[in-house]
Amino acid sequence: MRLLLYNIRYATGTGAAFHLPLPGAGYLRSNRKVLTRITEFIRAEQSDIVGLIEVDTGSVRTGMVNQAEHIASQIGHYSTYECKYGRSSLNQFVPIVRKQANAFLSAPHVRGERFHYFDIGIKRLIIELELEDVCVFLVHLSLKFRQRQYQLRSLHDLVVQAKKPVIVAGDFNAFWGTHEIYLFMRASGLRSANTHGLPSFPARVPRIELDFILVSAGIEVTDFRVPDVRYSDHRPLVCDFHVKAAA
């Protein structure tokens, strides 16, 4: 099976123009050409599971286009998504922001999906996708170090409850890379698919390993890549794996 993880930055693009006329102004405007390029890249990868971080589910920014559903329809996948903020968050009432989400696109038969929430941080969503042989969690952790540590503790509690082999994927915002999440991985019985610590951010000249695909025992990683794709500020991760037969 193949898992593709990509923080697409709401298909707002990159480059100097993103910060004009003011720093960060690009977050207010999506680009259909960028969305098309992202979709074409994802289609070409022929992934069984796609985890999307920072996807717009139909705000005025995208002309009411739900990016998760659009990409899913183009590649023939099932989609599930949810706003990444807590259900009681004031962000649920803010235009554009309330449509900022994370999403799974999946080709295999989905046994179940669950939305969990961290107790701390602005970005709180955890999506759990249960397939026949594996559970996959998708996260976007806090920018604040202390909040990330609390979130990792909660994520550990979810992972160890799983009855199947586990994959945890997402933008961890771990500015120290694997060193920052080492104890979480050891406690949860996870290891990084990115054995060489390849950086994924920023996309133009990657220097930091912010994005991770972590796997548990029972999963064999057969290939891992960070493609040179620059449609977002992050580069995507592509992981080929198979679930070992139970002994």
Residue ranges of predicted features:
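N-terminal, active-site-proximal structural segment of metallo-dependent hydrolase catalytic domains
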Residues: 1-74, 81-89, 244-247
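Structured beta-strand-rich core segments of catalytic domains in phosphoester-bond hydrolases
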Residues: 54-133, 225-228
